[in-house]
Amino acid sequence: MTMFNTIKREFQYGNQQVVIETGRIARQANSILVHMGGVTVLVAAVVKSDAKEGQNFFPLTVNYQEKMYAAGKIPGAYGKREGRASESETLTSRLIDRPIRPLFPEGYVNEIQITATVVSSDKTQSADIAALIGASAALAISDAPFNGPVAAARVGFINGEYVLNPTLEELKESDLDLVVAGTKSAVLMVESEAAELSEDQMLGAVLYGHQQQQIVIDNIASMAAEIGTAKQQYTAPVRNQTLETGMKEQFGTQVSDAYTITDKQARYSKLDEIKDAALAALAGDAESESYADTVSELKEIYNDLKYRTVRDNILSGKPRIDGRDLETVRALDVQVGVLPFTHGSALFTRGETQALVTTTLGNTRDVNMIDSLAGTIRDHFMLHYNFPHFSVGETGREGIPKRREIGHGRLARRGVQAMLPDSDRFPYVIRVVSEITESNGSSSMASVCGASLALMDAGVPIKAPVAGIAMGLVKEGERFAVLSDILGDEDHLGDMDFKVAGSKDGITALQMDIKIEGITPDIMEQALKQAHAGRIHILDAMNKVLPESRTEINAHAPNYAVIEINPDKIRDVIGKGGATIRQLTEETGAVIDIDDAGTIRIFGENKAATKAAIAKIEAITAEVEVGKTYEGTVARIVDFGAFINVLPNTDGLVHISQIADERVENVSDYLKEGQIVKVLVQDVDNRGRIKLTMKGIEQS
């Protein structure tokens, strides 16, 4: 009798063979082992049978982790073990969370923890798709009331064709890296970066990926049916109809009027005032045992009233919260060069959302070294997004970036990355920082706009300016409205968050999160069309201030130059044990990098430092020219002449017969070691030996 009751499903998914199995590893949790091509991921889901007392939110936690042993590596961190989650791991955790979270019933608050661990990797592909598939399968076989399964696909675009689940090498040739996740009937999430693809090409990729992933959904559903775990019986609490009616009748008009206040803080203050009045009027006796429960329920009813009010207003054709129609972008203000001693800066304001963005240019030593399963990555571009509490008028503890900040920073990075020059052409390391100083929706897209402007202000030769816009959706039955440039409230109360970044010629980044089913291709097409119009409007405003990159690098940025030397001279520049290059760096303050081909890249603090470094390197690597006169130092005297140092590390011989016009019997009668003399190069033989003469040369 076998110890394990293993259940498997095997199928072909693009070019990868996929095996999903359960019952062999981590049997005390709902576990799935996913083999996808050369990647193996263990996913375990733990579902609590009861909610904690007083729990009022859904405590779903997703942790994705890559174990270095998976690729036969030992971690480089202190202690030689894995530590805090990397940025990549954090982003993958979010990628798994986003399509799963909407598939639980509203009001469900039992704790669920999903742990996805990469345990084997051939380093040819990412493990995120396998991890998401495993998370979906683990929930499907559990007793959680999960309305899945959900599946995921990565889509590339190579030579005009969509490619399913491309490898890391194939992605280097691809104009698209798109991940789409969805259920049998609906797309739930899209995350992508692209090289200026059209709206039709992007929509086609989404639909292609959703169609291809159906085989995954079918196999997970088949496995779950075979296992047959009974699901938790969850019924949402029934609302008190008397309280709902009282709230709507007594305070519905006031809430509707409050949503005509265009200023965010004033509107929030008024809504809080109405809430306090509603609680006082409807909660009853504060001394009663049920008072706390009644207040809690009234708060939920009040939030639902706000939700319904905004949505009904939009669907009935009334102006939006701030008075706009569906397609109008908020008022824009664009400023560049606002911080005089940064390398590049911009202040981008859209309504009550504002980003102060800076660009800093560094040398090759500033590159971000990232240890990954695929090997060490040298990242020349960083974009960091900071969202302080004061940006929304709140207080709070500041600390390391949270998952949301990391995710928003990566989205903004995707928006501008395709426009950056190649590192061979522009070898600077680039760091962009977006400080959100005000926020009322779409701060990540404000970061895209500000980043584009700050890069151009710094003199980074980007291919074209980039702008971003966030779209929203309100849908009830067959009625729907697509909203351009959504506010924070519209994001919270809507059914879709749809962010698009790009140039005038195409899309560079697309992110979509959908909270409901029934989003048709026609709705997505309309959202993309509307986003294009909004993006062009924003680009026009940006181009009026700074239409293209400045022609010169900012004066405060490091000065850069590249020179070529004879590869045989590399050892002379480096010196014994690196002594010469260290001395060059100390004397000039420049950062000097040399490759095996003899290309030297020099980053000086200013032009003077760069020129000084070049002059010293040229002196070290210079080669003598026949017929040219040099001033040299007598290095060594021998019976048959003297060796003269004419260039650094370069000596030539003055034969005794070439020291003077008259006959020389004793070299020491004419020359002393350390003496400065002028010599003419007569010849350089095929072995590099230099023949010098002093005859006919006037000495000082």
Swiss-Prot record:
Q: Where does Mg(2+) bind?
A: D491, D497
What is an example of a GO molecular function annotated in this UniProt entry?
A: polyribonucleotide nucleotidyltransferase activity
**What does this protein need as cofactor?**
Mg(2+)
Which Pfam families does this UniProt record tie to the protein?
KH_1 (PF00013), PNPase (PF03726), RNase_PH (PF01138), RNase_PH_C (PF03725), S1 (PF00575)
Q: What is its EC number?
A: 2.7.7.8
Alphabetized SMART domains for the sequence: KH, S1
Instruction: List the CDD domains.
Output: KH-I_PNPase (cd02393), RNase_PH_PNPase_1 (cd11363), RNase_PH_PNPase_2 (cd11364), S1_PNPase (cd04472)
Pinpoint the KH domain residues: 558-617
> Main subcellular localization, coarse class?
cytoplasm
GO:BP terms for this protein?
A: mRNA catabolic process; RNA processing
Q: Is Membrane given among the entry's keywords?
A: no
Q: Keywords, A to Z?
A: Cytoplasm, Magnesium, Metal-binding, Nucleotidyltransferase, RNA-binding, Transferase
Compartments where located: Cytoplasm
Biological role: Involved in mRNA degradation. Catalyzes the phosphorolysis of single-stranded polyribonucleotides processively in the 3'- to 5'-direction.
Q: What family does this chain come from, according to its entry? A: Belongs to the polyribonucleotide nucleotidyltransferase family.
Q: Which HAMAP family match?
A: PNPase
Quaternary structure and partners: Component of the RNA degradosome, which is a multiprotein complex involved in RNA processing and mRNA degradation.
Q: What is this protein called?
A: Polyribonucleotide nucleotidyltransferase
Q: Which gene encodes it?
A: pnp
